C-alpha cells in the first residue's frame, strides 16, 4: 500500500531591499510515496538574482536546501543535499520550478521559496 505524503508549500515572494513587506500564499499538496512533486515559485520581479528553497519541519529550524543563482544560471545545493532528490530551474524570467523526486514520509513539511531582486 502506498502512503500519502502531505506537503504544505509556502511561497514568500521577493522582498525588495527598499521594502520590508512580505506577502505569502500557501498551497497544500498530497502525493503518494515514491512519486514526485513540482512546486512553482512566481517571482514579482524578472530574473531575481538569488532564489532560495527551504524546508521547515515541525519541531525543527527551517533548513535551506538549495538556491538558484540566475546571474550564472546555476544551482547551489547545501552540504548533504542530494542532487538526485531536489532540482530547480527557471521556467520563465518570473517563475522558478522546484522538483522533489522519489518522495518519502521524511519529505513532509512546509517548503518555502524566498528571493530578492538585488
Curated annotation (Swiss-Prot):
Pfam families: V-set. Residues 18-118 form the Ig-like domain. Keywords: Adaptive immunity, Cell membrane, Disulfide bond, Immunity, Immunoglobulin domain, Innate immunity, Membrane, Receptor, Signal, T cell receptor. Residues 1-17 form the signal peptide. Disulfide bonds join 41-113. PROSITE patterns: IG_LIKE (PS50835). InterPro entries: Ig-like_dom, Ig-like_dom_sf, Ig-like_fold, Ig_V-set, TRG_var/const_region. It is found in: Cell membrane. One of its GO terms (biological process) is adaptive immune response. The keyword Disulfide bond applies. The keyword Disulfide bond applies. It comes from the Eukaryota. One of its GO terms (cellular component) is external side of plasma membrane. V region of the variable domain of T cell receptor (TR) gamma chain that participates in the antigen recognition. Gamma-delta TRs recognize a variety of self and foreign non-peptide antigens frequently expressed at the epithelial boundaries between the host and external environment, including endogenous lipids presented by MH-like protein CD1D and phosphoantigens presented by butyrophilin-like molecule BTN3A1. Upon antigen recognition induces rapid, innate-like immune responses involved in pathogen clearance and tissue repair. PANTHER family: T CELL RECEPTOR GAMMA VARIABLE 8, T-CELL RECEPTOR GAMMA CHAIN. Gamma-delta TR is a heterodimer composed of a gamma and delta chain; disulfide-linked. The gamma-delta TR is associated with the transmembrane signaling CD3 coreceptor proteins following the stoichiometry: a single gamma-delta TR heterodimer associates with one CD3D-CD3E heterodimer, one CD3G-CD3E heterodimer and one CD247 homodimer forming a stable octameric structure. Upon activation, gamma-delta TR complex associates with FCER1G to initiate intracellular signaling. This is T cell receptor gamma variable 8. The gene is TRGV8.
